[in-house]
Amino acid sequence: MTDSIPKKPLKKGSLVFVDRGNYIKSIEALASDNDLPNYVFEGPGEILSVKDEYAQVRWRRPVPDVWFKLDQLKEYIQ
């Protein structure tokens, strides 16, 4: 039996950042630009929508919203 705290699911309104290790190993990284800007890895971005295993993320910059797999995102904690 483990005493770990259960992980909260990411949902609309959650603040997140992209986990560099999970993203680089993903098939999505192979199909995308391999030079993502640092702000996606530093956060925070806000989840606007969740569909199946993907989340639409908006950054606090004048850039388009982006879809990431939920397993590539981590909760942003200050």
Curated annotation (Swiss-Prot):
Its EC number is 7.1.1.-. Belongs to the complex I NdhO subunit family. NDH-1 shuttles electrons from an unknown electron donor, via FMN and iron-sulfur (Fe-S) centers, to quinones in the respiratory and/or the photosynthetic chain. The immediate electron acceptor for the enzyme in this species is believed to be plastoquinone. Couples the redox reaction to proton translocation, and thus conserves the redox energy in a proton gradient. Cyanobacterial NDH-1 also plays a role in inorganic carbon-concentration. Pfam families: NdhO. GO terms for cellular component: plasma membrane-derived thylakoid membrane. One of its GO terms (molecular function) is oxidoreductase activity, acting on NAD(P)H, quinone or similar compound as acceptor. This is NAD(P)H-quinone oxidoreductase subunit O. It is found in: Cellular thylakoid membrane. It catalyses: a plastoquinone + NADH + (n+1) H(+)(in) = a plastoquinol + NAD(+) + n H(+)(out); a plastoquinone + NADPH + (n+1) H(+)(in) = a plastoquinol + NADP(+) + n H(+)(out). NDH-1 can be composed of about 15 different subunits; different subcomplexes with different compositions have been identified which probably have different functions. Its main location: membrane. The keyword Thylakoid applies. It is an enzyme of class 7 (translocase). Keywords: Membrane, NAD, NADP, Plastoquinone, Quinone, Thylakoid, Translocase, Transport. It is a peripheral membrane protein.
